[in-house]
Amino acid sequence: YEVLGWGGYWAWDPVENVSFIPWLLATAFLHSSKAQLNESTLLNWNYFLGGIMFLSTIFGTFITRSGVLISVHAFSNGNIGIFLLTGLAFFTLFFLYAGSKNIKYFATSKKITHILGKSSFFIANNMLLFVSALIVFIGTVYPIFYETLYQRQLTIGRTFFDIMIGPLLLVLVFLMIFSTKISVKNLKFKKWITDNLKIVN
């Protein structure tokens, strides 16, 4: 079970990691999409998030099926890795092209004026989730570049991910608790502190 059961609970295996990255990005996208629907903000950020979320799913399939990383869950299947990498490159270029064609639309995005409003908490939520996804991505692909440059295998263990990701997710939990009591409009800082102290107590 420890080997075949996805690390027993969670072992930061490369294939586990690449399945975790789209989940983090999708969660961020769902939250920021609400800000776009309600207040017409974050248009360009949502386009960026939606694009890399889709690309991360192709990347995850590439890692799983190409055999470029050692994992108990990875399995290669002929030359499918080349096709997946080609598809990843194609959709990346398409994503950049479509974005460049819609610059005027992104410019219509409204600025966030409520410092202690829900949109600000959505941004903080997004930053934590995005940075977490970025750290997981770097920790997962770094061994590939290390082996290419130095011809030596490198494994990044769960200690790295626990130390780097744990505090971010802990802050995220606190934001989730407080943001449920935040109104859409701006609040006075003193009232915001008082309301959230009541929640903690």
Regions found by a protein language model. Give the residues of each.
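Hydrophobic residues within membrane-embedded alpha-helical segments of Major Facilitator Superfamily
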Residues: 24, 49, 56, 63, ...
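Contiguous transmembrane helix-bundle modules in multi-pass membrane proteins
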Residues: 14-21, 71, 75-201
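Membrane-helix interface "capping/anchor" motifs
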Residues: 34-45, 185-190
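Membrane-interfacial alpha-helical segments at the cytosolic side of multi-pass membrane proteins
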Residues: 21-34
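Interfacial helix-loop-helix junctions of multi-pass membrane proteins
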Residues: 1-15, 67-74
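Mobile "lid/hinge" segments at catalytic clefts and subdomain interfaces of large enzymes
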Residues: 52-58, 62-64, 68-69, 87-96
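Interfacial and helix-entry/exit segments of alpha-helical transmembrane bundles
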Residues: 40-57, 117-130
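Transmembrane helix-loop boundary segments of multi-pass membrane transporters
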Residues: 5-18, 39-46, 158, 165
